[in-house]
């Protein structure tokens, strides 16, 4: 009985600790995945957006617009959303910390002109 009790405690701690780790965005290669909303290949990494659910499911999008529409259609509350820094596409920014602008000076994959930046200063050359 004592051994079974300790096995249960060990199993519970393992599950809890595995779920407490920091979740980070995945690096992709161009064309490796398709957008989970519109099914276009993700080829322009400046617009790559990722989200993860509270259950650990990860979704990839070719544009911020697709992620927003996906969330609204599914009526979901993601655990985390990351957007690519337009100026440095291998860098992800948590969406809540990103400066997102809409401009006709940027051609995003879905045509919405949305792009994410790390700071307000970075957006100045792209403002209408």
Spans of features found by a protein language model:
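Post-signal-peptide N-terminal segment of Sec-exported extracytoplasmic proteins
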Residues: 36-75
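Bacterial signal peptide processing site
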Residues: 21-23
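Hydrophobic helical h-region of N-terminal Sec-dependent signal peptides
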Residues: 11-14
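Short metal-coordination and nucleic-acid-contact micro-motifs, chiefly zinc-binding Cys/His arrays
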Residues: 31
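Bacterial N-terminal signal peptides that target proteins for export
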Residues: 1-9
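C-terminal motif of bacterial Sec signal peptides marking the signal peptidase cleavage site
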Residues: 17-19
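Thiol/selenol-based redox catalytic cores and closely related redox-interacting motifs
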Residues: 80-128
